[in-house]
Amino acid sequence: MTSTRTETDTFGPIEVASDRYWGAQAQRSLGNFKIGWEKQPLAIVRALGIVKQAAARANMALGRLDPAIGDAIVKAAQEVIDGKLDEHFPLVVWQTGSGTQSNMNANEVVSNRAIELLGGVMGSKKPVHPNDHVNMSQSSNDTYPTAMHIACAERVIHDLLPALKHLHKALEEKVKAFDHIIKIGRTHTQDATPLTLGQEFSGYAAQVASSIKRIEMTLPGLCELAQGGTAVGTGLNAPVGFAEKVAEEIAAITGIGFTSAPNKFEALAAHDSMVFSHGAINATAAALFKIANDIRFLGSGPRSGLGELSLPENEPGSSIMPGKVNPTQCEALTQVCVQVFGNHAALTFAGSQGHFELNVYNPLMAYNFLQSVQLLADAAISFTDNCVVGIEAREDNIKAALDRSLMLVTALAPKIGYDNAAKIAKTAHKNGTTLREEAVGGGYVTDEEFDAVVRPETMIGPA
């Protein structure tokens, strides 16, 4: 039988497993919120550790916290930051919308670990109290939003942006490799005028580059922190200068330019910066969906599709059709993009629900944002390494499609007029003949004139 210790809160005593650092409120949450399997993201756990350490340092600097207690909190919080106490954060996403249970989970874990470091008895709340000391100058209402911003900014900066830059570099390499290959363009999924395969891939590279810039533009908002607003934004029970000092400490811990939000009422009641930042992530998903779709369609075949690209063959594709290989990386990426679209819909609605002085959809917003970041970062790397870098052009198929395209007639329009050029294309399509046969046979141009004008290599840029 598991040994327990007695923890207490304002509701009275409750038993907690002896080897767990959490306390009464986290234990009650385990019983009260048996909902789903989605746990608080470890990025949030780390961020809560950062907040607790920064708050202890700020409170000591402002003369509010006994240095002996503060130093123990700093050490215990560092273990949270380093991931050494992850197993002691068992709570699910689906809890109070302010994240109070998770904030108290952090307070209790840091308190009990600090007590242990000081040689005290876990659960005694002495000499380190979870509320009076670990949560000093804080409220869940400003702590969890601060942790959200820290976690989301860290993961965007350290995971998503590097992954997108990795993809961008690979696409740029394909732009150079394919620059000499002229192919038929397609608009409305129908034949259009020529371009190079490199030009086509340059569009993909530009989409990713623009996505990176858009996401970076949203970081200043994510780097504004609610800490110091306490319960409703007034800063009640926090000393003058605490908000600025704690933001300074968080910036020092993370190496990211976090600052104190200029208006704490907005920082608690609205999370527009989260919605805005995820909007850029959502736009990135839209871009990646388009890129993955184009690549898998251009690689369709191998004999009965467009067949302009040869995609890497990573695994068998069918349990019934021998030899079949599928564009699995494209399919995985597009599924991720769909999930991000759904996350954005939920996050947008949640962001609109700041009733009066507090938004109470915080855990949902944090979970969806962080899931989008992780999925897109992982998928971008997987797509790059297992698909993009190995893409090859099937130049024979590309040339065959170019040679039989009727849209090369566009080059004749300035010479013989739009209507005549249209007649040539329609007649050639109806009769199954070539543009040359109809243009020369119809007396519109001579063979020499046709050769001088209908040259795909001269049609890939301004005249």
Swiss-Prot record:
Signal peptide: none annotated. The keyword Cytoplasm applies. Its EC number is 4.2.1.2. Pathway: Carbohydrate metabolism; tricarboxylic acid cycle; (S)-malate from fumarate: step 1/1. Substrate binds at residues 98-100, 129-132, 139-141, 187, 319, 324-326. InterPro entries: Fum_hydII, Fumarase/histidase_N, Fumarase_C_C, Fumarate_lyase_CS, Fumarate_lyase_fam, Fumarate_lyase_N, L-Aspartase-like. It catalyses: (S)-malate = fumarate + H2O. It is found in: Cytoplasm. Gene3D superfamilies: Fumarase/aspartase (C-terminal domain) (1.10.40.30), Fumarase/aspartase (Central domain) (1.20.200.10), Fumarase/aspartase (N-terminal domain) (1.10.275.10). Keywords: Cytoplasm, Lyase, Tricarboxylic acid cycle. One of its GO terms (molecular function) is fumarate hydratase activity. GO terms for biological process: fumarate metabolic process; malate metabolic process; tricarboxylic acid cycle. The record marks 331 as: Important for catalytic activity. The active site is at residues 188, 318. Its main location: cytoplasm. GO terms for cellular component: cytoplasm. Belongs to the class-II fumarase/aspartase family. Fumarase subfamily. Involved in the TCA cycle. Catalyzes the stereospecific interconversion of fumarate to L-malate. There are 2 substrate-binding sites: the catalytic A site, and the non-catalytic B site that may play a role in the transfer of substrate or product between the active site and the solvent. Alternatively, the B site may bind allosteric effectors. PANTHER family: ASPARTATEAMMONIA/ARGININOSUCCINATE/ADENYLOSUCCINATE LYASE, FUMARATE HYDRATASE, MITOCHONDRIAL. Homotetramer. This is Fumarate hydratase class II. The lineage of its organism: Bacteria, Pseudomonadati, Pseudomonadota, Alphaproteobacteria, Hyphomicrobiales. The gene is fumC.
